[in-house]
Amino acid sequence: MVKVGIIGGSGLEDPNILLDPVTVAVDTPYGKPSDDVVEGTINGVECVLLARHGRKHDIMPGNVNFRANLWALYSRGVDVIIASTACGSLQENVEPGHLLFPDSVFDRTTGRQSTFFDGSYDQAPGVCHIQAHPTYNEKLRQVLISTAERCQLVHHRTGFGVCIEGPRFSTKAESMVFKSWGASLVNMTMMPECILAKELGIPYATTALVTDYDCWKEEDHVTASSVMKVFAANVEKAKTLFVEAVGEIGKIDWSAEILKLKTEARESVMISPDVVIPFLTTDNQKKF
Protein backbone atom coordinates (compact mmCIF):
# COMPACT_ATOMS: atom_id res chain seq x y z
CA MET A 1 0.00 0.00 0.00
CA VAL A 2 1.25 3.47 -0.89
CA LYS A 3 2.21 5.92 1.87
CA VAL A 4 1.56 9.60 1.11
CA GLY A 5 3.60 12.50 2.41
CA ILE A 6 1.75 15.79 2.81
CA ILE A 7 3.64 19.07 3.18
CA GLY A 8 1.23 21.66 4.48
CA GLY A 9 1.83 25.34 3.92
CA SER A 10 0.31 28.06 6.07
CA GLY A 11 -2.94 26.81 7.61
CA LEU A 12 -2.78 23.31 6.11
CA GLU A 13 -0.92 21.65 8.93
CA ASP A 14 -4.11 20.55 10.70
CA PRO A 15 -3.57 16.99 12.02
CA ASN A 16 -7.35 16.57 12.26
CA ILE A 17 -7.47 15.61 8.60
CA LEU A 18 -5.84 12.35 9.72
CA LEU A 19 -7.58 9.44 11.41
CA ASP A 20 -5.80 8.29 14.59
CA PRO A 21 -2.97 10.86 14.34
CA VAL A 22 0.31 10.04 16.07
CA THR A 23 3.10 12.60 16.47
CA VAL A 24 6.62 11.35 15.71
CA ALA A 25 9.85 13.25 16.39
CA VAL A 26 12.35 12.88 13.54
CA ASP A 27 16.01 13.82 13.19
CA THR A 28 17.91 13.70 9.90
CA PRO A 29 21.50 13.91 8.61
CA TYR A 30 20.59 17.45 7.54
CA GLY A 31 19.29 18.63 10.89
CA LYS A 32 15.82 18.95 12.36
CA PRO A 33 12.77 19.33 10.12
CA SER A 34 10.37 22.23 10.64
CA ASP A 35 8.35 20.25 13.18
CA ASP A 36 7.52 16.73 14.30
CA VAL A 37 5.65 14.74 11.68
CA VAL A 38 2.12 13.50 12.28
CA GLU A 39 1.18 10.05 11.00
CA GLY A 40 -2.27 8.62 10.46
CA THR A 41 -4.63 7.60 7.67
CA ILE A 42 -6.91 9.32 5.18
CA ASN A 43 -9.50 7.16 3.43
CA GLY A 44 -7.59 4.10 4.58
CA VAL A 45 -4.29 5.32 3.10
CA GLU A 46 -1.27 5.83 5.35
CA CYS A 47 -0.14 9.47 5.44
CA VAL A 48 2.66 11.51 7.00
CA LEU A 49 1.91 15.21 7.53
CA LEU A 50 4.60 17.87 7.96
CA ALA A 51 4.06 21.60 8.53
CA ARG A 52 6.52 23.43 6.27
CA HIS A 53 6.75 26.51 8.51
CA GLY A 54 6.21 24.61 11.77
CA ARG A 55 2.81 24.25 13.38
CA LYS A 56 3.23 27.68 15.00
CA HIS A 57 4.19 29.19 11.64
CA ASP A 58 7.37 30.60 13.17
CA ILE A 59 9.86 29.71 10.41
CA MET A 60 10.23 32.23 7.59
CA PRO A 61 10.57 30.89 4.03
CA GLY A 62 14.33 31.39 3.75
CA ASN A 63 14.93 29.57 7.04
CA VAL A 64 12.90 26.45 6.23
CA ASN A 65 15.18 23.41 6.36
CA PHE A 66 13.87 21.95 3.13
CA ARG A 67 16.46 19.16 3.07
CA ALA A 68 15.53 17.98 6.56
CA ASN A 69 11.83 18.19 5.72
CA LEU A 70 12.14 16.02 2.62
CA TRP A 71 14.52 13.60 4.33
CA ALA A 72 12.15 13.27 7.28
CA LEU A 73 9.34 12.20 4.95
CA TYR A 74 11.67 9.81 3.11
CA SER A 75 12.81 8.29 6.41
CA ARG A 76 9.18 7.66 7.39
CA GLY A 77 8.70 5.64 4.22
CA VAL A 78 6.58 7.93 2.06
CA ASP A 79 6.25 6.92 -1.59
CA VAL A 80 4.74 10.12 -3.04
CA ILE A 81 4.45 13.69 -1.78
CA ILE A 82 1.71 16.27 -2.29
CA ALA A 83 2.12 19.82 -1.03
CA SER A 84 0.27 23.11 -0.74
CA THR A 85 1.69 26.59 -1.07
CA ALA A 86 0.22 30.09 -0.83
CA CYS A 87 0.81 32.22 -3.93
CA GLY A 88 0.12 35.65 -5.37
CA SER A 89 -1.39 35.84 -8.84
CA LEU A 90 0.40 37.57 -11.71
CA GLN A 91 -2.41 37.15 -14.24
CA GLU A 92 -5.92 38.63 -14.26
CA ASN A 93 -7.68 35.33 -14.90
CA VAL A 94 -5.97 33.58 -11.97
CA GLU A 95 -8.14 35.02 -9.23
CA PRO A 96 -7.74 34.98 -5.44
CA GLY A 97 -9.50 31.88 -4.17
CA HIS A 98 -8.56 29.80 -7.20
CA LEU A 99 -6.28 26.76 -7.15
CA LEU A 100 -3.48 26.25 -9.68
CA PHE A 101 -1.41 23.16 -10.37
CA PRO A 102 2.05 24.40 -11.44
CA ASP A 103 3.98 22.59 -14.14
CA SER A 104 7.22 24.55 -13.70
CA VAL A 105 8.95 27.17 -11.56
CA PHE A 106 11.46 30.00 -12.01
CA ASP A 107 13.93 30.10 -9.11
CA ARG A 108 14.77 33.56 -7.72
CA THR A 109 15.83 32.39 -4.25
CA THR A 110 19.29 33.01 -2.85
CA GLY A 111 21.44 30.90 -0.56
CA ARG A 112 19.07 28.02 0.15
CA GLN A 113 20.51 24.53 0.54
CA SER A 114 19.19 23.01 -2.66
CA THR A 115 20.86 19.59 -2.92
CA PHE A 116 21.50 16.57 -0.73
CA PHE A 117 24.77 15.98 -2.58
CA ASP A 118 26.98 18.69 -1.07
CA GLY A 119 29.49 16.46 0.70
CA SER A 120 27.94 16.85 4.14
CA TYR A 121 26.55 13.29 4.31
CA ASP A 122 28.58 10.23 3.34
CA GLN A 123 25.55 8.35 1.99
CA ALA A 124 24.97 11.12 -0.57
CA PRO A 125 28.35 11.11 -2.36
CA GLY A 126 29.25 12.84 -5.59
CA VAL A 127 27.53 15.75 -7.31
CA CYS A 128 23.94 15.46 -8.53
CA HIS A 129 23.01 17.25 -11.76
CA ILE A 130 19.31 16.45 -11.51
CA GLN A 131 17.05 17.30 -14.44
CA ALA A 132 14.74 20.12 -13.37
CA HIS A 133 12.24 19.40 -16.15
CA PRO A 134 9.66 18.14 -15.64
CA THR A 135 9.70 19.97 -12.33
CA TYR A 136 6.63 18.18 -10.98
CA ASN A 137 5.54 14.58 -11.42
CA GLU A 138 2.96 14.58 -14.19
CA LYS A 139 1.17 11.42 -13.06
CA LEU A 140 0.64 12.91 -9.60
CA ARG A 141 -0.30 16.31 -11.03
CA GLN A 142 -3.03 14.68 -13.08
CA VAL A 143 -4.46 12.99 -9.98
CA LEU A 144 -4.74 16.40 -8.29
CA ILE A 145 -6.28 17.99 -11.39
CA SER A 146 -8.88 15.25 -11.90
CA THR A 147 -9.74 15.39 -8.19
CA ALA A 148 -10.24 19.17 -8.34
CA GLU A 149 -12.54 18.69 -11.33
CA ARG A 150 -14.55 16.05 -9.53
CA CYS A 151 -14.83 18.25 -6.43
CA GLN A 152 -15.87 21.22 -8.62
CA LEU A 153 -13.06 23.42 -7.30
CA VAL A 154 -12.16 26.36 -9.53
CA HIS A 155 -8.66 25.66 -10.75
CA HIS A 156 -6.06 26.12 -13.48
CA ARG A 157 -4.36 23.06 -14.94
CA THR A 158 -1.05 24.70 -15.87
CA GLY A 159 1.14 27.71 -15.14
CA PHE A 160 4.52 28.46 -13.69
CA GLY A 161 5.50 30.31 -10.55
CA VAL A 162 8.38 32.60 -9.68
CA CYS A 163 9.84 31.64 -6.31
CA ILE A 164 11.30 34.66 -4.51
CA GLU A 165 13.45 34.65 -1.39
CA GLY A 166 11.05 36.54 0.88
CA PRO A 167 9.96 37.17 3.52
CA ARG A 168 9.12 40.52 1.95
CA PHE A 169 6.63 40.72 -0.90
CA SER A 170 7.72 41.86 -4.36
CA THR A 171 8.33 45.46 -5.34
CA LYS A 172 6.05 46.72 -8.10
CA ALA A 173 8.98 46.67 -10.54
CA GLU A 174 9.65 43.01 -9.72
CA SER A 175 5.98 42.11 -9.95
CA MET A 176 5.63 43.76 -13.37
CA VAL A 177 8.73 41.98 -14.68
CA PHE A 178 7.52 38.58 -13.42
CA LYS A 179 4.13 39.23 -15.02
CA SER A 180 5.79 40.16 -18.33
CA TRP A 181 7.61 36.82 -18.31
CA GLY A 182 4.26 35.08 -18.48
CA ALA A 183 4.43 33.69 -14.95
CA SER A 184 1.10 32.87 -13.34
CA LEU A 185 2.25 33.01 -9.72
CA VAL A 186 4.74 34.47 -7.27
CA ASN A 187 5.63 32.49 -4.18
CA MET A 188 8.30 31.98 -1.50
CA THR A 189 8.46 28.19 -0.95
CA MET A 190 8.17 26.37 -4.29
CA MET A 191 11.97 25.99 -4.38
CA PRO A 192 13.98 23.92 -3.62
CA GLU A 193 11.34 21.51 -2.30
CA CYS A 194 10.44 20.07 -5.71
CA ILE A 195 14.09 19.57 -6.70
CA LEU A 196 14.96 17.80 -3.46
CA ALA A 197 12.07 15.40 -4.01
CA LYS A 198 13.49 14.63 -7.46
CA GLU A 199 16.91 13.91 -5.93
CA LEU A 200 15.23 11.35 -3.66
CA GLY A 201 13.32 9.81 -6.56
CA ILE A 202 9.95 10.59 -4.96
CA PRO A 203 6.98 11.69 -7.11
CA TYR A 204 6.03 15.21 -5.99
CA ALA A 205 3.35 17.72 -6.98
CA THR A 206 2.10 20.91 -5.39
CA THR A 207 -1.16 22.83 -5.24
CA ALA A 208 -0.92 26.62 -5.37
CA LEU A 209 -3.54 28.40 -3.27
CA VAL A 210 -4.01 31.84 -4.83
CA THR A 211 -4.47 34.53 -2.18
CA ASP A 212 -3.92 37.91 -3.89
CA TYR A 213 -2.86 39.83 -7.01
CA ASP A 214 0.59 40.72 -5.68
CA CYS A 215 1.21 44.46 -6.31
CA TRP A 216 1.09 44.75 -10.11
CA LYS A 217 -2.65 45.45 -9.94
CA GLU A 218 -3.15 49.01 -8.69
CA GLU A 219 -6.37 48.44 -6.73
CA ASP A 220 -5.31 45.16 -5.09
CA HIS A 221 -2.01 45.61 -3.27
CA VAL A 222 -0.98 42.61 -1.22
CA THR A 223 -0.76 42.70 2.59
CA ALA A 224 -0.22 39.92 5.11
CA SER A 225 -3.72 40.44 6.57
CA SER A 226 -5.44 40.34 3.17
CA VAL A 227 -3.54 37.19 2.26
CA MET A 228 -4.64 35.38 5.41
CA LYS A 229 -8.32 36.27 4.89
CA VAL A 230 -8.40 34.60 1.49
CA PHE A 231 -6.10 31.82 2.59
CA ALA A 232 -8.46 30.74 5.36
CA ALA A 233 -11.11 29.97 2.74
CA ASN A 234 -8.55 28.34 0.45
CA VAL A 235 -7.38 26.02 3.21
CA GLU A 236 -10.80 24.40 3.36
CA LYS A 237 -10.71 23.83 -0.40
CA ALA A 238 -7.23 22.33 -0.12
CA LYS A 239 -8.33 19.99 2.67
CA THR A 240 -11.21 18.78 0.52
CA LEU A 241 -8.85 18.30 -2.41
CA PHE A 242 -6.19 16.43 -0.44
CA VAL A 243 -8.60 14.12 1.37
CA GLU A 244 -10.15 13.07 -1.93
CA ALA A 245 -6.83 12.95 -3.80
CA VAL A 246 -5.20 10.70 -1.20
CA GLY A 247 -7.95 8.16 -1.75
CA GLU A 248 -7.26 8.22 -5.50
CA ILE A 249 -3.48 8.02 -4.99
CA GLY A 250 -4.03 4.92 -2.87
CA LYS A 251 -5.68 3.13 -5.81
CA ILE A 252 -2.64 3.52 -8.09
CA ASP A 253 0.39 1.26 -8.47
CA TRP A 254 3.35 3.66 -8.23
CA SER A 255 6.08 1.01 -8.59
CA ALA A 256 7.09 1.81 -12.18
CA GLU A 257 6.97 5.56 -11.60
CA ILE A 258 9.19 5.39 -8.52
CA LEU A 259 11.61 3.00 -10.24
CA LYS A 260 11.91 5.44 -13.16
CA LEU A 261 12.52 8.44 -10.89
CA LYS A 262 15.09 6.67 -8.72
CA THR A 263 16.92 5.46 -11.81
CA GLU A 264 16.96 8.98 -13.27
CA ALA A 265 18.19 10.42 -9.98
CA ARG A 266 20.98 7.85 -9.66
CA GLU A 267 22.09 8.47 -13.24
CA SER A 268 22.27 12.20 -12.45
CA VAL A 269 24.98 11.68 -9.82
CA MET A 270 28.52 12.18 -11.13
CA ILE A 271 30.23 9.25 -9.45
CA SER A 272 31.19 5.71 -10.40
CA PRO A 273 28.14 3.54 -11.07
CA ASP A 274 29.68 0.98 -8.70
CA VAL A 275 29.12 3.32 -5.74
CA VAL A 276 25.94 2.42 -3.86
CA ILE A 277 23.69 5.32 -2.89
CA PRO A 278 21.31 3.67 -0.40
CA PHE A 279 18.30 5.90 -0.90
CA LEU A 280 18.48 5.49 -4.69
CA THR A 281 18.88 1.73 -4.84
CA THR A 282 16.21 -0.08 -6.81
CA ASP A 283 16.88 -3.52 -5.34
CA ASN A 284 13.95 -4.92 -3.36
CA GLN A 285 11.75 -2.20 -4.81
CA LYS A 286 8.51 -1.85 -2.85
CA LYS A 287 5.53 -3.56 -4.44
CA PHE A 288 2.09 -1.99 -4.29
Swiss-Prot record:
InterPro entries: MTAP, Nucleoside_phosphorylase_d, Nucleoside_phosphorylase_sf, Purine_phosphorylase-2_CS. It comes from the Eukaryota. Pathway: Amino-acid biosynthesis; L-methionine biosynthesis via salvage pathway; S-methyl-5-thio-alpha-D-ribose 1-phosphate from S-methyl-5'-thioadenosine (phosphorylase route): step 1/1. Its main location: cytoplasm. NCBIfam families: MTAP. Catalyzes the reversible phosphorylation of S-methyl-5'-thioadenosine (MTA) to adenine and 5-methylthioribose-1-phosphate. Involved in the breakdown of MTA, a major by-product of polyamine biosynthesis. Responsible for the first step in the methionine salvage pathway after MTA has been generated from S-adenosylmethionine. Has broad substrate specificity with 6-aminopurine nucleosides as preferred substrates. Homotrimer. This is S-methyl-5'-thioadenosine phosphorylase.
